[in-house]
Amino acid sequence: SITLDLSRPQGRRLARKLVGISDVVLENFTPRVMFNWGLDYDHLQKVRPDLIMVSLCGMGQTGPWRNFAAFGATIQALSGLTYLTAYTPDQPIGLGYAHADHAAGLSATNGQGGG
């Protein structure tokens, strides 16, 4: 495996090279981050026209929350899951682990292979 520092130009250059020989890109940044780095779908499709790209931006690609990061605990709270797992209505506690993070990753990997 490799690690790329996408905040650096050389990391982004290497990422684009890898896209050229890849079938699928899966990422979980906010849309603003990928666009600013030139690594959003519109840019990467020019490198590899038949690219499959899966974006796990938890707050969506559009809408007022699109540039907010989504973490498992945040999504659990916003969805009402922390309320459902509370001992009492005034003390929500959540699941104790990031169920939403695992579910999102599993759904994304299953979804990209379905075409």
PLM region descriptions:
Residues F35-G115:
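Active-site-adjacent "lid/gating" segments in soluble enzymes
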Residues S1-K46:
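A structured beta-alpha segment of the ubiquitous adenosine-cofactor-binding alpha/beta core
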